[in-house]
Every structure is written in structure tokens, then in C-alpha cells.
């Protein structure tokens, strides 16, 4: 690749602009907002990893997928810092601290984890569909290989997108008219493949999600109070709770896709507007439409980092995970009294509100589904 110190690179990079002028004020403001979200997303995903790793209320396959996604989201925040800090330094101090090779590696890492986390909804829905349709045996049988298979697919997909881009990038001119970390190292064909593949998987996931919700609702309404299999009861319970965990994620995904589609539409419009014009006029026309710093395209970056907070928002929808979240920060204090008299047998235990704490099998099942009813509301 062309060195950022070569005269050719400097001539095409700076042009009539100084280094700090290459980053517009609009770029700078959006970068600050994005870094703020990254600053929040990174520790929250780390906390979420700790919570999931220490919970026993989720099936191992679901825990594997959620931890994998949180790792990708945390790395995504790091990759954005790697890309944006050199641009902020250029704006504030008129100094270039990066190189083409550094920014190429940073953006390759960024695209890899973005691709991996982009199929999160798909792999989680696939795992939950297996858990729902195989609820009689999913918990009792060793079905753990599906979690590793889906996780492998998740990361392989992201790497596949990067590999396609690098193959398509070979042979293209290595003259860059912008700062190294402002350059988009992705080709149009690679972006097209990623968009189409992501759209197909998301549509499939949404349709499957609707089927899973319908199936679990039917199962809930046709429940039998003579059910005695604890594994079956547990799996039905976890299916209901995990569905509520997915709802915030799909809401954020839909909103993000709307804004992302808007951004892509602007880029398509720019391309259509300049393709019939002389080469020397294309830059001026594109700048007039999307801004000198291409600020409109940064809407996608903001949408991407907001989706990294989706799982953290999802904690609130999952009763057990939210309880652990509160316990981690001291909002829930459990101080059981020890030394209870032996005369208080387990069959007579009552809570402070006077309600029974122990039940027969039928009473336990009724109490269990009463709790589930609160989740469905």
C-alpha cells in the first residue's frame, strides 16, 4: 500500500485543505457523539458477559451466543476508537498520527465484528426456534453442539465479508484523496453482498421469530397443570422469558435498518447523480449532496453503535438477568435469616406477605404459569 508519508499520498490527501480541515466540524461533532456511545457500550457489554457467564437460568447454547455477541460488540467499540481517535487528533492538533496500513487493519477489524454482530438476531432466533420446537427434549438432551455451530457461523460470516472485500480490493488504484482513517476500504460489490446476505437472514429471522412467538403462545394457552416433567416446565419458562429478551433487540434492529436504508439510499442517489457527469465534476456534486465530510453516511455509524446497546436494554426485559444486573450494583440485597427453628418445616414456610413459599407439584405449576402470564402482558 502507498505510504502516508509519500509525496503522492500527501498531494492527493491534503489538496487545498490542511489536515484539520479534512475533518469537518460536522464530522467532529458526530465523532464525539459516537465515541460517547462507544464509551457506554464497552463496559455495559463487559458487565453483560459477566452476568451471562454466571447465570444458570439460560440454556448453555443461548449463553454461548449472547456472550459471543457481547464480545463482538465490545471489540466493535474498540475498533471505532482506533478509527476515530486519529481523526479527532487531526482536527484538534492538525497532526496525522495514523497510516494507511493502520487504518486498513482497524477498519478490517471493524468490518469483521460488525458482520459477526450483524447476524446476532438470526443466530439467536435459530437457537430459540430449536429450543421451542424441541422443548420436550432440548433441556434434557445434550444439544450443546448447536451453540458452537451457530457461533462459528456468526464469526465466519464476518470474516467471509472481510475476505470478499479484500479480494475485490486487489488491483484497485492505491491513491487516496482523504485522511487514512476517512477512507472507505470496502468495495461496492462487497457492500452489496453484505447488504443482500444480511437482509435475507434478517427477513428469515423475523418470519421465524413470528412462528416461534405463535408456537409458544399456543403452548402456553394449552398447558396442562398435570405436567410433572421439571425439564419440560423449565424449557417452556425459559422460552417465554427469552422471547421477551429478543423483543427489544428486534425493535432496535428495525429502527436502525430504517435509518441505514435512508443512508444507503442517499449514497445510491449520489452515485446516480454523478455517474453521467465528467470525472472532474463528480467530487463537487457528491460533496454538495452528502457534505464535504460525507456527514450523511455517518448516520449508519451512529445506528450501528446504538444497536450495540440493544442487549443491555434487553436485560431489563429478562427477569432473571435483570435481577442479576441489579444485584451486581447493590440494588437487590438478599439477606436470608439463618438459624430457623427446626419446628418450622418446609411445608409450613410462608413469606412476609403471608403467602405460601412451598407448593405441591400442581400448585407449583400453577404458580409458575401465573408468573409467565406477567411476562406475556
Curated annotation (Swiss-Prot):
It is a multi-pass membrane protein. One of its GO terms (molecular function) is G protein-coupled receptor activity. Residues 53-73, 126-146, 210-245, 316-377 are cytoplasmic. It holds the Pfam family 7TM_GPCR_Srab. It is found in: Cell membrane. Residues 1-31, 95-104, 168-188, 267-298 are extracellular. Its main location: membrane. Keywords: Cell membrane, G-protein coupled receptor, Glycoprotein, Membrane, Receptor, Transducer, Transmembrane, Transmembrane helix. InterPro entries: 7TM_GPCR_serpentine_rcpt_Srab, GPCR_Rhodpsn_7TM, NRL-GPCR1. The chain crosses the membrane at residues 32-52, 74-94, 105-125, 147-167, 189-209, 246-266, 299-315. Glycans are attached at residue 16. Gene3D superfamilies: Rhodopsin 7-helix transmembrane proteins (1.20.1070.10). It comes from the Eukaryota. The keyword Transmembrane applies. One of its GO terms (cellular component) is plasma membrane. Belongs to the G-protein coupled receptor 1 family. This is Probable G-protein coupled receptor F27E5.5. It comes from Caenorhabditis elegans. The lineage of its organism: Eukaryota, Metazoa, Ecdysozoa, Nematoda, Chromadorea.
Amino acid at each position: 500500500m502507498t505510504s502516508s508519508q509519500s509525496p503522492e499520498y500527501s498531494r492527493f490527501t491534503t489538496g487545498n485543505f490542511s489536515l484539520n480541515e479534512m475533518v469537518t466540524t460536522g464530522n467532529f461533532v458526530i465523532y464525539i457523539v459516537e465515541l460517547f456511545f462507544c464509551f457506554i457500550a464497552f463496559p455495559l457489554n463487559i458487565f453483560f458477559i459477566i452476568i451471562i457467564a454466571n447465570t444458570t437460568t439460560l440454556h448453555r447454547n443461548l449463553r454461548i451466543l449472547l456472550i459471543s455477541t457481547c464480545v463482538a460488540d465490545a471489540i466493535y467499540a474498540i475498533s471505532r476508537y482506533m478509527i476515530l481517535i486519529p481523526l479527532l487528533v487531526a482536527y484538534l492538533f492538525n497532526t496525522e498520527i495514523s497510516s494507511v496500513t493502520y487504518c486498513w487493519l482497524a477498519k478490517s477489524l471493524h468490518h469483521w465484528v460488525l458482520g459477526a454482530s450483524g447476524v446476532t438476531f438470526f443466530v439467536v432466533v435459530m437457537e430459540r426456534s430449536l429450543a421451542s420446537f424441541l422443548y420436550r427434549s432440548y433441556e434434557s438432551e445434550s444439544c450443546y453442539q448447536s451453540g458452537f455451530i451457530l457461533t462459528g457461523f456468526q464469526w465466519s460470516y464476518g470474516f467471509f465479508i472481510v475476505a470478499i472485500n479484500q479480494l475485490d480490493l486487489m488491483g484497485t488504484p492505491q491513491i487516496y484523496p482523504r485522511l487514512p482513517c476517512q477512507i472507505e476500504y470496502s468495495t461496492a460489490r462487497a457492500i452489496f453482498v453484505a447488504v443482500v446476505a444480511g437482509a435475507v437472514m434478517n427477513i428469515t429471522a423475523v418470519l421465524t421469530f413470528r412462528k416461534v412467538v405463535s408456537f409458544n403462545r399456543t403452548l402456553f394457552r394449552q398447558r396442562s397443570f398435570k405436567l410433572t416433567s421439571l425439564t419440560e416446565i423449565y424449557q417452556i419458562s425459559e422460552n417465554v422469558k427469552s422471547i421477551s429478551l429478543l423483543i427489544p433487540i428486534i425493535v432496535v434492529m428495525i429502527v436502525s435498518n430504517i435509518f441505514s436504508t435512508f443512508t444507503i439510499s442517499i449514497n445510491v442517489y449520489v452515485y446516480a447523480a454523478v455517474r453521467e457527469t465528467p470525472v472532474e465534476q463528480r467530487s463537487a456534486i457528491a460533496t454538495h449532496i452528502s457534505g464535504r465530510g460525507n456527514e450523511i453516511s455517518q448516520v449508519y455509524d451512529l445506528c450501528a453503535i446504538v444497536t450495540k446497546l440493544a442487549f443491555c436494554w434487553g436485560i431489563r426485559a429478562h427477569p432473571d438477568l435483570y435481577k442479576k444486573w441489579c444485584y451486581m450494583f447493590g440494588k437487590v440485597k438478599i439477606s436470608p435469616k439463618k438459624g430457623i427453628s427446626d419446628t418450622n418445616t418446609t411445608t409450613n414456610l410462608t413469606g412476609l406477605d403471608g403467602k405460601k413459599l412451598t407448593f405441591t407439584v400442581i400448585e407449583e405449576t400453577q404458580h409458575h404459569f401465573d408468573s409467565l402470564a406477567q411476562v406475556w402482558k
